[in-house]
């Protein structure tokens, strides 16, 4: 995968050179290029200007972005604009991006964008209902979430297939050594070696955690018959506990 990032602050992306993203680059699975669009700005390297019609703040000018995009060699890239007014970023979207060969991220700053910049864009994406100073942190988050899904980046394919949200549910609790730490013991079922009992326990725990913490995820979740029976039992148990 090839990723190009348009930003005023390339140095902010230094953390991407480490951990999973750095390993993906070392394996030759990822190529990242940073483009400071101030280098393409006319008018004394100014990248922002006042909005027509008045208003608060400054807008990112179209010219530096267009000229930077013209300088990037890409055949058919997915162009992502980081914008708090964009569609929310989800795990399923990261899975979709992981299938692409070329991604371009445009990181804004200031009050907003000249609307004409959006003619270059295929996707307008937001991390959530809050506003950041710039798009860099959002881009890094999205890149990290996407790159780890590229085949062969992680050691085991199953290591991300069982992540929270990958199945549509939150992940079940997990434990490692020691068995007993400060009086807190690993559930007996995980020590039993009975794979079917462990599978059912994990399914129950995943459904229960999702129901208690993110019930909205269950509104669109496609339950199997087995999951539906377990989920109904969970709700009944919790309801009895409230009475």
Curated annotation (Swiss-Prot):
Subcellular location, principal: cytoplasm
Residues reported to bind S-adenosyl-L-methionine: 108, 127-132
Keyword presence, Transferase: yes
UniProt keyword list: Cytoplasm, Methyltransferase, S-adenosyl-L-methionine, Transferase, tRNA processing
Organism: Streptococcus equi subsp. zooepidemicus (strain H70)
Location within or outside the cell: Cytoplasm
NCBIfam families per UniProt: PRK00026.1 (NF000648), trmD (TIGR00088)
Enzyme superclass (EC): transferase
EC number: 2.1.1.228
Example of a GO cellular component annotation carried by this entry: cytosol
Described function: Specifically methylates guanosine-37 in various tRNAs.
Record text on subunit structure and interactions: Homodimer.
GO BP annotations listed: tRNA N1-guanine methylation
Family (UniProt): Belongs to the RNA methyltransferase TrmD family.
Gene3D superfamilies recorded: 3.40.1280.10, tRNA(m1g37)methyltransferase, domain 2
UniProt gene name: trmD
InterPro entries, sorted: Alpha/beta_knot_MTases, tRNA_m1G_MeTrfase_C_sf, tRNA_m1G_MeTrfase_TrmD, tRNA_m1G_MTases_N, tRNA_MeTrfase_TRMD/TRM10
GO molecular function, one term: tRNA (guanine(37)-N1)-methyltransferase activity
Reactions the enzyme catalyzes: guanosine(37) in tRNA + S-adenosyl-L-methionine = N(1)-methylguanosine(37) in tRNA + S-adenosyl-L-homocysteine + H(+)
A Pfam family: tRNA_m1G_MT
Stated name of the protein: tRNA (guanine-N(1)-)-methyltransferase
